[in-house]
């Protein structure tokens, strides 16, 4: 996940999940749950800094099944193996703290942390995150003779 404020990233994470997911839905659902925890934490920090945010935090997910799972409070036989703490996202969606929305895979900026991307997509996501690459000569120092 990646959270942005203004034009730059303020929080991001990319971790290997602790257990093997049995489906892409489960993997995305777990990732959304971790992002929801981060969203709640960031809102609390902003509130402590005097910037309360009343609107729900939008979380974008490219898996429709995991969005449906988070919005539906009914437990299904197919989801009983998912560890209970991952259902935290359901509570936050139902409480109105988090708004889980679908986003096209082509626009999923957080993919910069987890996937090999082509140059065009890499530059697009870097721009979206507010990342820049400094001029290489300024990093290495000048190799030109400046004594003349």
Model-derived segments and spans:
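Short, well-ordered secondary-structure "scaffold" segments embedded in the functional core
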Residues: 8-10, 22
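Acidic, metal-ligating active-site segments
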Residues: 1-7
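RNase H-like nuclease module associated with reverse transcription
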Residues: 15-148
């Amino acid at each position: 996940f990646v959270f942005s404020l203004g034009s730059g990233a303020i929080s991001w994470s990319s971790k290997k999940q602790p257990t093997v997911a049995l489906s892409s839905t489960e993997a995305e659902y777990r990732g959304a749950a971790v992002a929801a925890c981060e969203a709640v934490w960031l809102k609390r920090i902003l509130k402590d800094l005097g910037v309360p945010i009343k609107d729900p935090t939008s979380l974008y997910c490219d898996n429709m099944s995991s969005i449906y799972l988070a919005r539906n409070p009914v437990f299904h036989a197919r989801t009983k193996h998912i560890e209970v703490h991952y259902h935290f996202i359901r509570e936050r969606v139902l409480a109105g703290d988090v708004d889980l929305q679908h986003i096209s895979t082509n626009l999923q900026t957080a993919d910069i942390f987890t996937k090999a991307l082509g140059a065009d997509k890499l530059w697009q996501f870097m721009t979206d995150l507010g990342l820049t690459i400094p001029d290489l000569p300024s990093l290495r120092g000048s190799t030109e003779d400046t004594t003349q």
